[in-house]
Amino acid sequence: MAILSDRDIKRYIEEGLITIDPLDDPERQIQPSSVDLRIGNEFKGFRVIRKPCIDPKDPSDIESYMETFHVEDGPFIIHPGEFALATTHEYIALPEDLVARVEGRSSIGRLGITMHVTAGYIDPGFHGRITLEISNIGKMPVALYPRQRVCQIVFETMTSPAERPYGHPSRDSKYIGQTRPQTSRIKDDYEIRNSRL
């Protein structure tokens, strides 16, 4: 596998192999081996409710814990210890022979903010806005502004195209085409759905 350079990223975009929409400021967003992505304006945060735990087997459970916030003007404030979901402002589409990784920008990390908890890997064939799993591990609240550059995407070539890329009918591609922050769809995992646990 090889990481795409800035010149390769530009070529892939020009040839329609990678979609990044909108890419409003390519000169600022395209870095030597990545593309800076911005945060969208919709956030999902946990409500405080009285339940002992989140149960992945209860399909109504997970959504009931989340509250949606739309931010048009001004910041979304994330407090120490809080967790929120958001998406990138940009819609991303990958071909069947390219994977991507999302990493938080160093400037954001130095404020105590992580941009993804575990889901930094993007499968070949994915298209949609990338979910950001944001948490504040610092000691101060931090303001995040819609369309602020918060993360970067790195592209890597594969040795051959995927036989069953993300979105293939035979795959459980639960988040294909997402345009808004999506809560966990763990209830759709095979072992949960078929009561294998």
Swiss-Prot record:
Pathway: Pyrimidine metabolism; dUMP biosynthesis; dUMP from dCTP: step 1/1. Its EC number is 3.5.4.30. The record marks G120, Y121 as: Important for bifunctional activity. GO terms for biological process: dUMP biosynthetic process; dUTP biosynthetic process; nucleobase-containing small molecule interconversion. The active site is at E133. GO terms for molecular function: dCTP deaminase (dUMP-forming) activity; dCTP deaminase activity; nucleotide binding. It comes from the Archaea. The keyword Amino-acid biosynthesis does not apply. It catalyses: dCTP + 2 H2O = dUMP + NH4(+) + diphosphate. InterPro entries: dCTP_deaminase, dUTPase-like_sf, dUTPase_trimeric. The keyword Transcription does not apply. Residues 165-174 have a biased composition (Basic and acidic residues). DCTP binds at R105, S106, S107, I108, G109, R110, D123, T131, L132, E133, Q152, Y166, K174, Q178. Residues 161-183 are annotated as: Disordered. HAMAP family: dCTP_deaminase (MF_00146). Homotrimer. Belongs to the dCTP deaminase family. This is dCTP deaminase, dUMP-forming. It comes from Methanothermobacter thermautotrophicus (strain ATCC 29096 / DSM 1053 / JCM 10044 / NBRC 100330 / Delta H).
